[in-house]
C-alpha cells in the first residue's frame, strides 16, 4: 500500500528558532488556548524550503476552499487572505536575526516531538532555546474565524541541529561557565 503524502506538510531545511515556546504551552491572552509555538527564521537562500512552503500553502488553500468560502458567495483569492510565510526584511527591519530571511510562526495545542541531530529525544529544556538552529515539520491548513480567514501553520515536531547564539540578549549558563580558566579553580 502506498504511503499517503500530505501536500500541506513540510519538513524545513535548517532554520533558526525564535520565540521558542516548545516545552510549555502559553496563551496569548486570557481568551485563547495555551499553545506550543516557535518562529522559524528561514534564510532566503534556502529556496528549496521556501518553495516547499509556498506549495504547501497552495495545497492548504485548495483543500480548504469550503472553509475559506464560509457564508460568502465565492472563495477569496489566496493573495487576499492571511498567509504564514512572511518577509523578515519587511516585517522586522530592525531585528538583525530576521535579516535576509523569511519566517513562519507555527503553533500547536499538543506538544511537539523534540529530537537532536541523531533523532534521539531531547529531555533537557536548556538544549532548546531561541537562537538554536534546527529543522521543523509543519503543516498548513485553512481557517475562517469571525475576524479573519487565511492559511495557518501547525507545529508538528522539531529537530535541533546545532547551537546558536541565544536571541533576546540572554546567555546560556553552560556558555558563561565553560572556560578552561574557570575549571582550574579546584586545583
Model-derived features: where do they sit?
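Acidic, gly/ser/pro-rich intrinsically disordered tails
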Residues: 1-6, 165-187
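Short intrinsically disordered coil segments
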Residues: 54-59, 118-121, 169-180
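Exposed beta-sheet edge/beta-hairpin loop segments within beta-rich domains
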Residues: 115-134, 141-151
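OB-fold ssDNA-binding interfaces and closely related basic DNA-contact patches used
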Residues: 1-103
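Short, basic/aromatic beta-hairpin or loop at an interaction surface
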Residues: 103-117
Amino acid at each position: 500500500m502506498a504511503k499517503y503524502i500530505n501536500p500541506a506538510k513540510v519538513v524545513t531545511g535548517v532554520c533558526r528558532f525564535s520565540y521558542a515556546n516548545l516545552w510549555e504551552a502559553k496563551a496569548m491572552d486570557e481568551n485563547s488556548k495555551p499553545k506550543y509555538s516557535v518562529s522559524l527564521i528561514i534564510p532566503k537562500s534556502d529556496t528549496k524550503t521556501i518553495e516547499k512552503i509556498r506549495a504547501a500553502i497552495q495545497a492548504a488553500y485548495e483543500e480548504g476552499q469550503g472553509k475559506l468560502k464560509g457564508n460568502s458567495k465565492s472563495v477569496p483569492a489566496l493573495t487576499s487572505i492571511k498567509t504564514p510565510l512572511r518577509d523578515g526584511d519587511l516585517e522586522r527591519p530592525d531585528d538583525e536575526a530576521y535579516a535576509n530571511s523569511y519566517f513562519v510562526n507555527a503553533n500547536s495545542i499538543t506538544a511537539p516531538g523534540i529530537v537532536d541531530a541523531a533523532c534521539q529525544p531531547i529531555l533537557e529544556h536548556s538544549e532548546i532555546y531561541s537562537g538554536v538552529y534546527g529543522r521543523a515539520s509543519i503543516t498548513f491548513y485553512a481557517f475562517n474565524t469571525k475576524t479573519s480567514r487565511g492559511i495557518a501553520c501547525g507545529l508538528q515536531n522539531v529537530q535541533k541541529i546545532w547551537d546558536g547564539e541565544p536571541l533576546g540578549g540572554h546567555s546560556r549558563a553552560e556558555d558563561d561557565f565553560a572556560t578552561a580558566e574557570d575549571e582550574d579553580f579546584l586545583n
